[in-house]
């Protein structure tokens, strides 16, 4: 007779006796199928699944799509007067990464941590460090809130732009026709600041996306530029069985229709053998021209789209939700009203950490799932180059050994220079495994600004939302403990606090004999007055009082 898990967990002490030690190891799915958790989320509480389209439902192939955007932007710059030589540049995917900051004053690309400390600094293709860096950044630090000067290149659409900025700065710095200055460059009596150059690039990128031929060239060759996954119809059909599904994209209807038709263009439906269905049938609500992040605030007028012409019908839509109708504009409040859902009922899935994740989290309280396509490469390096990580751990052990028997009375100064050089070399090798700018999430042991934003705003994240296919809709995504250094570096061994020298070490915060304390207080106060405060001391809670990030709703549990 087998024992159920619930029976075993009635008495925690019985669990090891009923299981072999191998069974106690936590089961984890394949790394490339995993969904990673920052804040616990119970899937059975999600009533609506929301999607962005670009780089979420429709993942653009890299580097083909970035190369196309890069070429079109360069052509636009040349058409407005930039040098013809720029047409010789080709997109190099090994250089840029997301989350870099462009300094519009000095023309530098910066990789920073959450607090603005510099991790990497590049002027064009030249990586600068040491005294050269301190001339422009005396404390190796930037004020991130100075948005007039510092621009964060956070999206996947920013990758071609990031590399183009490096190309331009390098060209104008090194081309003999131009005189390089600290804040720009000169051509005779003409001066161009890096700020002006940056604005030209921003305008060119916007022109390519909204007025140029980027979308036209994309739909002309969808197989070349868009990833098509046969598991997409299956996952969305399963989501629709347990809740409502909506699409909210900034793209217009004509482009959305062509992309989505391609993504769902299979001879069968959700499963082999089932009949083919149009892409619209997988959604309860379709909303285009969303204009995120404005969409998560005041939004825009909600209008109806004529799906035959792609044009908008006149007037504001004020009716109830109707299946088969495509809407334009609106706001996140509109979605909640039409679907009959409130903030935490909705899991919104997108790739844009600001436009999709931050705003939906801060303004609406929606649960958030961030799609990070680069995570596949990050996991590959993490697993394939494990020897580098292991060597760093070994070097830390060697370093600790040198100081093992030394305290403040020691005059001995161990020579750690060779270990330090090796640590720097191994750390550099590790960084270069990700690309010239290193990992999206860290430089050495320090986390990047992008990593801190992911941890702060994304409840869940993965390389692809398709990974949800490998979890049941009753799953509890439980966040792992985030350990501080005094927890991650100290073994779970007994320490006698009475032997510690700290004056607070013997302060017992776990239990107090309240009855004895009450008696003593009563002896002291009874002669003064028979009147006592209603409560002389707090009682130790007998039930759970702390929020443990288990996505629990106490009121709902009580109602049940």
UniProtKB/Swiss-Prot annotation:
Sequence segments annotated as region (Disordered): 541-560
Active site: 52, 54
Cofactor note: Binds 1 Mg(2+) ion per subunit.
Sites of Phosphoserine modification: 418, 502, 511, 527
Binding site for IMP: 52, 54, 202, 206, 215, 249-251, 292
Cellular component GO terms held in the UniProt record: cytosol
GO-annotated molecular function: 5'-nucleotidase activity; ATP binding; GMP 5'-nucleotidase activity; identical protein binding; IMP 5'-nucleotidase activity; metal ion binding; nucleoside phosphotransferase activity; ubiquitin protein ligase activity
GO biological process: allantoin metabolic process; amide catabolic process; dGMP catabolic process; GMP catabolic process; GMP catabolic process to guanine; IMP catabolic process; IMP metabolic process; negative regulation of defense response to virus by host
Reactions that this protein is recorded to catalyse: a ribonucleoside 5'-phosphate + H2O = a ribonucleoside + phosphate; a 2'-deoxyribonucleoside + a ribonucleoside 5'-phosphate = a ribonucleoside + a 2'-deoxyribonucleoside 5'-phosphate; IMP + H2O = inosine + phosphate; GMP + H2O = guanosine + phosphate
UniProt keywords, alphabetically: Allosteric enzyme, ATP-binding, Cytoplasm, Hydrolase, Magnesium, Metal-binding, Nucleotide metabolism, Nucleotide-binding, Phosphoprotein, Transferase
Annotated positions binding Mg(2+): 52, 54, 351
Description of activity control: Allosterically activated by various compounds including ATP, 2,3-BPG/2,3-Bisphosphoglyceric acid and Ap4A/P1,P4-bis(5'-adenosyl) tetraphosphate. Binding of an allosteric activator is a prerequisiste to magnesium and substrate binding. Inhibited by inorganic phosphate.
E.C. no: 3.1.3.5, 3.1.3.99, 2.7.1.77
Biased composition (Acidic residues): 550-560
Primary location recorded for the protein, binned into one broad class: cytoplasm
Family: Belongs to the 5'(3')-deoxyribonucleotidase family.
Subunit text: Homotetramer.
Protein name, entry field: Cytosolic purine 5'-nucleotidase
UniProt organism field: Mus musculus
